[in-house]
């Protein structure tokens, strides 16, 4: 298979979150060992960040022009983080939810920024032991980010369905493809953004939230897609963390293509309007993943047809540099991470393994997937 990675798309960046596990039992650690965070900063530099729990870290990329650049950086970053973790008796795991970890064991990060989150959100924050994939796509200054957001928004449940990797919670099947997004729904300002027509309206809304004490800072608006508060991008936040790097790259490419199409669209021909079916499609993606039934253009379609519709509506300039992303996503329709985890778990139980050993083996397989090369061939 050859991969078209022409460097002519919008610039973008990717953020991946990881759990830190005890190498001996593959459960989350309460705290990282002394020296681990410093070693990560020495190795990954400004691209490494701590997260809201001490058993979590994040890798945030530089700015990319091509998916090939993203594959090289994140492939190396995953390897480096994994090797550092092993040096400290840990393993690093990229997945939406840990299959058997108990969230009550997770220790909150005492840094002031995170302490305020736990103070404000209480048990909602404590329960949110999840990892996500965030993708930033640069928006030219000549375009209004909120207008672009509203045009891209109806497609986001499709991206969630493709990314779903959190079917387990606390050692049990959750019944959802993305339990992570169900937990996100407990937070304020973390689901579907309001129908604000432009950035002026967005800024007025943020000012109201600040002035009334609803938020402490602009970054506390955590919608599933939002204008970044510090860089000129739209930030996709709906997706689960992807065990396989290739899946994360595919989602980044699809999002970049959809944003590119929204930028190129004639605003007179594409009015900003809220899709009445958005909430139902979001539930279908959260519950069923790619097996969901989606309401699109007045009819019910499967995820495969919806993905084809998304790609068809992107003009050549929006597709350019993202062709591989679409091809890979077509393969994801056959089996997402959530579906694969459930299939493997079922296979292990049918072979006679007890619940916990089967879940531990599932974590071992996810760790192996984390280090699979992307864009090979």
Curated annotation (Swiss-Prot):
GO terms for biological process: modified amino acid biosynthetic process. ATP-dependent carboxylate-amine ligase which exhibits weak glutamate--cysteine ligase activity. It catalyses: L-cysteine + L-glutamate + ATP = gamma-L-glutamyl-L-cysteine + ADP + phosphate + H(+). Belongs to the glutamate--cysteine ligase type 2 family. YbdK subfamily. Its EC number is 6.3.2.2. Signal peptide: none annotated. This is Putative glutamate--cysteine ligase 2. It comes from Pseudomonas aeruginosa (strain LESB58). GO terms for molecular function: ATP binding; glutamate-cysteine ligase activity. Keywords: ATP-binding, Ligase, Nucleotide-binding. It comes from the Bacteria.
